[in-house]
UniProtKB/Swiss-Prot annotation:
Function: Involved in virulence. Induces cytotoxic effects on mouse macrophage cell lines, via direct or indirect enzymatic hydrolysis of cell membrane phospholipids. Hydrolyzes phosphatidylcholine.
Gene Ontology CC annotation, any one: extracellular region
Principal location class: secreted
Induction profile: Expression is induced in vitro in the presence of phosphatidylcholine.
Effect of inactivating the gene: Disruption of the gene in the clinical strain Mt103 leads to a reduction of the phospholipase C activity of the mutant. The plcABCD mutant exhibits a dramatic decrease in phospholipase C activity. The quadruple mutant is attenuated in the mouse model of infection, but not in infected THP-1 cells.
Species, as recorded: Mycobacterium tuberculosis (strain CDC 1551 / Oshkosh)
Protein name: Phospholipase C D
Catalytic activity: a 1,2-diacyl-sn-glycero-3-phosphocholine + H2O = phosphocholine + a 1,2-diacyl-sn-glycerol + H(+)
Places the protein is found: Secreted, Cell wall
Family stated for the protein in its record: Belongs to the bacterial phospholipase C family.
Encoding gene (name): plcD
Superkingdom of this protein's organism: Bacteria
Length: 514
């Protein structure tokens, strides 16, 4: 394939379409992403081969929920009593303290509303996730949901998808590297986890505007005062930007907190780096222009609009399109792509079940428990001081010429691991990171395969734009209602059969630094 064309469209035409129309324009001509990317040159076997790190965060999915059936992972073939959760009876379709529900498939092809694709939004609050975790026993998922969700929606947390339902996600897992021990940072909702993604803390001691334990309807503005990773990067002379989608106006940042930098007092100065690089850049227009002009910064945080975020009840297909969209942009400039690592992660599990019990800090561990005097005065706390994390497992892809798949990494990571990757690569320390968290999580260098030359050949990733187009209109009623806990419930099948994992492909383990 010509290096100047993507899917039959020239680089310049493609970038112009992205800048002019965003996702809507792209959907009109979406095709196979790239059948073959461009040669990335000889491998030197060093992390320094990677000059650009792009962090792309989606919303609210657990690892078992997406990849419990994926081959080579700690998934449904694992022998564990935790797959049998008590609290709902599939036979009677009712709450039942002794009833057992196992993971069951959300079939995205059934029904006029595709209710398997657009399911109700589970409770994923600080309280609900701590109650699900249940002191590390991890056996209280259904009773925790029953406190805030209707009876018919309570078992939603046990639903999962297969390759048939989210084909693009599975093809990405086959083409690159997947982490099956990547945990969200907080046993709680979106905003606390995104704060960890940017700064490695929620200010549990309450010294600088925290602690933040909930996700308010409106994003806080200049409320927090602790140091964030972009400030450390600026001080070290390492370029960075936060690219956020603005195509839907204020709605673009609903649920995803795309303007997160403005939550910090340091952003009050319009001349500051935080405003110039953390507020002004847009996605996809500014990002696409920077890629084409060879001025992509060393570090990019990218936040798509809420309709592409995968937040329930938005369909996963729309999120697949968003991931492929950012890949198209990077591939439009081979000189940039060959030196780039794209890490796609999910802010938190969204309330969806995962059988792996996360590591958590012992009581009293500095920085890992809320220590303000009156915990009941902290919004969303429910009187719970912690542990803060780790939270539950979420999907994570490492997409790069240096992470060719199918590969699987079993090392433990969380959102602060992305920041530690920058620390290792550029020598810029992560602010606020606790000694405990540093001791239990890695820096993600093990996700790269530097022992072999980089491989840029790509599979055909289907037609995600067209797939999203066919799904979204049918999901509109349930997507709108499901986001506010009023969607059409998905009936739990009876009798239940424990799902199994795929047997192929076989997944290798990357070399890491060599």
């Amino acid at each position: 394939m010509s290096q100047s064309h993507i899917g039959g469209v020239s680089r310049r035409e493609f970038l112009a379409k992205v800048a002019a129309g965003g996702a809507g324009a792209l959907m009109s001509f979406a095709g196979p992403v790239i059948e073959k990317a461009y040669g990335a040159g000889p491998c030197s076997g060093h992390l320094t081969d990677i000059e650009h790190f792009v962090f792309f965060m989606q919303e609210n999915r657990s690892f078992d929920h997406y990849f419990g059936t994926l081959s080579g992972t700690d998934g449904f073939n694992t022998v564990s009593p935790l797959f049998q959760q008590k609290g709902w009876n599939p036979m009677t379709q009712a709450l039942d303290a002794t009833g057992v529900t196992m993971p069951y498939r959300f079939d995205t092809t059934r029904g006029p509303f595709l209710d398997g694709a657009c399911v109700n939004d589970p409770d994923h609050s600080w309280v609900a996730m701590h109650e699900s975790w249940n002191g590390g026993v991890n056996d209280n998922w259904l009773p925790a949901q029953a406190k805030t969700r209707s009876a018919a929606h309570t078992p939603t947390v046990m639903g999962y998808y297969t390759r048939q339902d989210i084909p693009i996600h599975y093809l990405l897992a086959d083409a690159f590297t997947v982490c099956d021990r990547y945990f969200c940072s907080v046993l709680g909702p979106t905003l606390p986890n995104r704060l960890y993604w940017l700064s490695a803390t929620i200010d549990p001691d309450g010294q600088n505007g925290g602690p933040e334990l909930q996700s308010p309807t409106f994003q806080p503005v200049r409320r927090f005062g602790w140091r964030i990773m972009p400030q450390n990067l600026s001080d070290a002379g390492v370029s960075w930007k936060v690219y956020r989608n603005k195509t839907l106006g204020p709605i673009s940042s609903v649920l995803t907190y795309g303007s997160l930098v403005t939550s910090f007092k340091q952003s009050a100065d319009p001349r500051s780096d935080l405003v110039r690089f953390g507020v002004a850049p847009s996605y996809p227009a500014s990002f696409a222009a920077d890629v084409l002009a060879n001025r992509l910064p060393r570090v990019s945080w990218v936040i798509p609009n809420v309709l592409e975020s995968e937040h329930p009840a938005v369909p996963a297909a729309a999120g697949a399109f968003a991931i492929v969209n950012i890949l198209r942009i990077l591939l439009a400039n081979p000189a940039v792509w060959e030196k780039t690592a794209l890490i796609v992660s999910y802010d938190e599990n969204g309330g969806f079940f995962d059988h792996v019990v996360p590591a958590t800090a012992p009581a009293g561990t500095p920085g890992e428990y809320v220590t303000v005097p009156d915990i009941d005065q902290v919004p969303g706390s429910g009187g719970i001081r912690g542990p803060i994390g780790l939270g539950f497992r979420v999907p994570c892809f490492v997409i790069s010429p240096y992470s060719r798949g199918p590969q699987m990494v079993h090392d433990t990571f969380d959102h602060t691991s992305q920041l530690r990757l920058l620390e290792t690569r550029f020598g810029v320390p992560v602010p606020n990171l606790t000694a405990w968290r540093r001791s239990v999580t890695g820096d993600m260098t093990s996700t790269f395969n530097f022992a072999v030359p980089p491989n840029s050949s790509w599979p055909n990733l289907d037609y995600p734009g067209l797939h999203a187009l066919s799904t979204v209109p049918q999901c509109v009623p349930n997507a709108a209602l499901g986001t506010i806990n009023r969607g059409i419930p998905y009936r739990v099948p009876d009798p239940q059969i424990m799902p199994t994992q795929e047997t192929t492909p076989t997944r290798g383990i990357p070399s890491g630094p060599c």
